[in-house]
């Protein structure tokens, strides 16, 4: 019996091969999208869950207005010990720094993830000494390090690394490996290769560390986080409050540090998952609509099977076998799509898992979808199975509600397609606006920078750049605005005309002059720019800083630095510029010719070790190649890097760009599904209504009249879908645009273009099939019937 079911199922799939192929490919895309998106979300939400007591480890950050995520990324060194002494819930607390470093081993330069810790880190994290000594933890011992087993294997193979030396590109003396320690899973935010001792600076006014704590097993986590948030630390003139405790396992997605965000933000991955679910739902409805239409066309066949003794169970098994075969083929093609996109997807999602794991997870998700699809299809199959023999054979049917499911299904698919296209179009328009708007307050088009750690080679490299025909303008000894090197914060609590309810103001300071403003083509609104002849504490503010102070006439106004009372005088105001992530409003910033920290701080801040230049349109590849060749030839041992400012700014939008590509692909898939569904339905309907079309032609109807019957129906469905899709899409995208300080407009022409484009595609998809049916000879049709 099973063999018979399989033969009948295969025969019907081949009979409607076009519809079957469309359904298989549609569901295969849906399977692949949903499986990969679900795997992606699970991967993002399980970072660092492998730690012993991972749910008790927290990262401590301070609320910071104006930062990209509302939190400061660094804390003072004394904070860890203070939390351990003050809160009984804290079992251990430590300071660490995590960054990528460059080391040379046998003349080869390698990038290693460096974890710089204090000795208290062993009370918070599971770091085990496997070989060697703990000399790397001795304070101010910068010539000893520990490496992981994985790193040791990578650098030295099977040889013991103890006693071997490596060379940091940032210091002259070699570094000795004194220990081998355990490594963590790569599925971690702190996936280290090398461990060093962090430096100590017992001053509450300097923040440069990450503070982590481990709570006791009995601690009330919610109560502690609220108590910590309400706690105020006062050390002299320094007041610290509103500390936020973020679980280690949530650091990947819960307001991560801006420079450590994933390639695609979790909220965008979630949107992709929802979109993938909609795609697979469209694909299922697409096939279910075709399947129901085929069941109707096979009504007499099913009735004859019933007359000849087929039971309800056998009819259900017959139909579900056909459906199951199609789902299995869709699953196989879906796995094939996953295999094709796996390398690209692994890089985009930053997966640290094997290919076999992805296949196993994807297969599990696809299996769940297959179960859902069978349950979804069971109702219509049971419904038609239970129809009486008389109603199946009878040709008299009530016109009202006829083909309602088909119309609802097509409308839903069109609605999803229009929504995807509209959202992707608005997103594309917004990203174009951010790259090309004049409201950035600066011109970064065709701008690049050569960055280095000293001024030794600045003049020689500047002369080389000036000699290049590809370079239009050179500005040495300036700091890049995007991804700056060395900007500092100036805090103030005291200024002229301060309102009683005003909050403290923090200003980002840039050591720059007139040539910098001219290079970036920034706008000086009033006053003058600082120069070498300016007074020591003259400062130029941006509009955001003036607004924070509450001034209407800022020129000549003064304010005092918090930690030492040093006064500063405003001599100019520049237009706001957006050099950070576009989701962040312009922050208070200022320009000084020179800025010294003063007070008890002994170091001098400099940001002059860079060269800015502007290259000619379309010459970046050539320009980059020439500069890199020169640097490798003339300065092979110097840390000199080339940075394209436009590319660095584009990294702020990397998540949005990835989401745009994903949504664009899904929009294309959904549109094709809808169009193919309409084409398949029209093909089936034309075959079902051949006799009706022939009779209409005999009674005087021409091809245009017959085309109008079908066009009118699908035009109505398209309009209904648009009435729902456009308002929903507008509401979603308007909310999404609120994340950006510079927003594009949702133009009226966008609606017209999308509607007209989809209408044309639908017209082309149904036009040929209806035209072919309308041009058949009525006599031949009647004879065949």
Predicted regions span which residues?
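Membrane-helix entry/capping segments
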Residues: 3-6, 11, 15, 19, ...
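Intracellular coupling helices
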Residues: 6-14, 18, 22, 26, ...
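Generic structural signal for small/hydrophobic residues in well-ordered secondary structure
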Residues: 13, 23, 44, 60, ...
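Hydrophobic alpha-helical transmembrane segments of multi-pass inner-membrane transport and secretion
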Residues: 15-42, 264-300, 327-328, 405-430, ...
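Small-residue-rich transmembrane alpha-helices
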Residues: 32, 36, 244, 323-389, ...
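Membrane-proximal extracellular/periplasmic loop immediately following the first transmembrane helix
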Residues: 37-102, 108, 207-214, 223-227, ...
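Mid-to-C-terminal secondary-structure elements
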Residues: 118-133, 145-264, 463-651
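C-terminal transmembrane helical bundles of large multi-pass transporters
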Residues: 637-718, 722-723, 733
């Amino acid at each position: 019996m099973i063999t018979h079911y399989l033969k009948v199922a295969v025969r019907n799939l081949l009979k409607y091969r076009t519809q079957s192929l469309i359904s298989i490919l549609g569901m295969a895309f849906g399977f692949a999208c949903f499986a990969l998106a679900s795997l992606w979300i699970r991967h993002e939400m399980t970072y660092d869950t492998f730690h012993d007591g991972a749910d008790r480890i927290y990262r401590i950050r301070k609320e910071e207005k104006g930062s990209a995520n509302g939190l400061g990324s660094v804390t003072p060194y004394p904070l860890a010990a203070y939390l351990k002494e003050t809160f009984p819930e804290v079992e251990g607390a430590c300071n660490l720094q995590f960054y990528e470093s460059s080391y040379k081993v046998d003349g080869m330069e390698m990038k290693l993830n460096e974890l710089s810790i204090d000795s208290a880190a062993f009370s918070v994290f599971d770091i085990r000494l496997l070989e060697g000594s703990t000399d790397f933890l001795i304070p101010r011992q910068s010539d000893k390090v520990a490496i992981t087993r994985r790193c040791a294997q990578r650098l030295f193979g099977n040889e013991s690394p103890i006693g071997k030396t490596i060379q940091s590109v940032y210091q002259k003396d070699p570094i000795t490996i004194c220990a081998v320690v355990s490594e963590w899973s790569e599925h971690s935010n702190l996936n280290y290769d090398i461990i060093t001792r962090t430096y100590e600076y017992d001053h509450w006014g300097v923040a440069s560390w990450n503070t982590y704590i481990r709570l006791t097993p009995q601690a009330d986590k919610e109560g502690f986080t609220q108590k910590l948030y309400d706690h105020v630390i006062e050390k002299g003139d320094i007041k610290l409050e509103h500390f936020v405790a973020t679980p280690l396992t949530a650091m990947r997605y819960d307001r991560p540090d801006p420079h450590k965000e994933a390639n695609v933000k979790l909220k965008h991955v979630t949107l992709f998952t929802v979109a993938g679910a909609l795609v697979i739902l469209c694909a299922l409805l697409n096939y279910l609509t075709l399947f129901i239409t085929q069941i109707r066309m096979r009504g007499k066949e099913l009735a004859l099977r019933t007359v000849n003794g087929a039971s309800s169970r056998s009819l259900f098994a017959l139909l579900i076998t056909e459906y199951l075969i199609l789902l299995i083929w869709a699953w196989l093609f879906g796995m094939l799509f996953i295999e094709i996109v796996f390398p690209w997807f692994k890089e985009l999602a930053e997966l640290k898992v094997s290919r076999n794991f992805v296949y196993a997870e994807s297969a599990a998700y696809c299996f769940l979808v297959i179960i859902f699809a069978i349950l979804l299809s069971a109702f219509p199959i049971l419904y038609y199975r239970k129809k009486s023999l008389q109603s199946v054979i009878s040709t008299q049917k009530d016109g009202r509600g006829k083909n309602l499911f088909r119309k609802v299904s097509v409308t839903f698919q069109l609605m999803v397609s229009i929504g995807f296209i509209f959202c992707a179009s608005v997103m594309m328009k917004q990203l174009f606006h951010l790259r090309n708007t004049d409201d950035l307050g600066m011109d970064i088009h065709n701008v690049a920078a050569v960055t280095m750690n000293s001024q030794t080679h600045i003049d020689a490299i500047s002369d080389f750049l000036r000699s290049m025909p590809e370079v239009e303008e050179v500005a040495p000894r300036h700091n890049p605005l995007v991804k700056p090197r060395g900007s500092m914060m100036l805090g103030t609590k005291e200024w002229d005309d301060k309102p009683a309810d005003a909050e403290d103001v923090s200003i980002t300071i840039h050591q720059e002059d007139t040539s910098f403003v001219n290079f970036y083509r920034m706008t000086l609104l009033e006053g003058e720019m600082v120069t070498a002849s300016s007074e020591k504490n003259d400062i130029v503010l941006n509009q955001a800083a003036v607004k924070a102070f509450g001034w209407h006439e800022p020129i000549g106004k003064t304010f005092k630095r918090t930690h030492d009372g040093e006064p500063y005088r405003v001599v100019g105001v520049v237009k706001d510029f957006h050099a950070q992530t576009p989701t962040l409003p312009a922050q208070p910033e200022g320009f000084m010719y020179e800025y010294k920290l003063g007070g008890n701080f002994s170091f001098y801040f400099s940001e002059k070790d860079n060269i800015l230049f502007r290259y000619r349109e379309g010459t970046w590849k050539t320009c980059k190649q020439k500069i890199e060749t020169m640097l490798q030839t003339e300065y092979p041992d110097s840390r000199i890097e080339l940075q394209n400012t436009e590319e660095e700014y584009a990294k702020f939008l990397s998540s949005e760009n990835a989401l745009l590509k994903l949504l664009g692909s899904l929009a294309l898939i959904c549109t094709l599904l809808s169009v193919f569904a309409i084409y398949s339905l029209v093909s089936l309907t034309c075959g079902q209504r051949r006799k009706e079309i022939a009779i209409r032609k005999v009674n005087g109807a021409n091809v245009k009249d017959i085309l109008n019957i079908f066009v009118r129906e699908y035009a109505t469905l398209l309009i209904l879908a648009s009435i729902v899709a456009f308002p929903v899409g507008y509401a979603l995208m308007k909310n999404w645009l609120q994340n950006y300080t510079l927003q594009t407009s949702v133009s009226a022409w966008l609606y017209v273009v999308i509607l007209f484009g989809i209408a044309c595609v639908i017209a082309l998809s149904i036009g040929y099939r209806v035209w072919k049916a309308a041009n058949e000879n009525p006599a031949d049709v009647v004879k065949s019937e």
